[in-house]
Regions:
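Radical SAM enzyme core and accessory elements
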Residues: 159, 169-193
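Conserved AdoMet/S-adenosylmethionine-binding subsite of the radical SAM
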Residues: 2-160, 164-165
Length: 193
């Protein structure tokens, strides 16, 4: 995964996917290509209409509109109800399991209520919820969840029948984990100015 929103640049991303798939390109099967999105509903709908057997990963972060809108402004444009309809359509046409990326923010989206909201959102979808502990960034007001929070949250998800995995943390101690490198680059650029 990289920075940027692929579905905001749909035409170019489709050109890239076509090249990646072509035998005279990189020759990678569509089934091994994943498009990650923050949840741009129009782009998901367009992707559905193409019937490409690519995988889809959606940064969900929260399954409650108020919480998701507070950490992901895209949710104010495309609330969860619209996102879910688009995902159902995508899954109906592509018959692929969807990955929901769920960055765990300490004390914000790791509660029992959050787990129940997540279970409700995933009902009727074939998904894998990829739980990702937040990597601390000095300039942002979020904290990593405590181990006890993660255990309680995953225990609740398990009891609710939510299919999940926990991403193994890499690079956190060197400030080189997901999200941290961009933060360091921005900080470095500000210092130079």
């Amino acid at each position: 995964m990289g920075m940027g929103e692929p579905l905001a640049n749909f035409t170019e991303v489709m050109k890239a996917i076509t090249y990646i798939h072509r035998e005279d390109g990189i020759n990678i099967s569509y089934r091994r290509i994943t498009i990650s999105t923050c949840g741009l509903v129009p782009g998901i709908k367009r992707l559905s209409e193409l019937h490409l057997p690519v995988r889809l990963a959606v940064s969900l972060v929260a399954a409650d509109d108020d919480v998701r809108s507070s950490v992901m402004p895209v949710n104010t444009r495309f609330p969860l109800s619209e996102l879910k309809k688009a995902l159902i359509s995508f899954q109906h046409r592509n018959e692929k399991r969807i990955t929901l990326e769920y960055c765990m923010l300490g004390g914000i989206n790791t509660t029992e209520k959050a787990a129940k909201s997540l279970q409700k959102f995933t009902k009727g979808l074939e998904v894998l919820v990829n739980l990702i502990p937040w990597n601390p960034i000095d300039s942002l007001p979020f904290s990593s969840p405590l181990d006890s929070e993660v255990r309680k949250f995953t225990s609740t998800l398990k009891s609710l029948g939510v299919n999940y995995s926990i991403r193994r943390e890499k690079g956190r101690s060197a400030d080189a984990a997901c999200g941290q490198l961009a933060s360091e680059t921005m900080k470095s650029n500000l210092i130079k100015q």
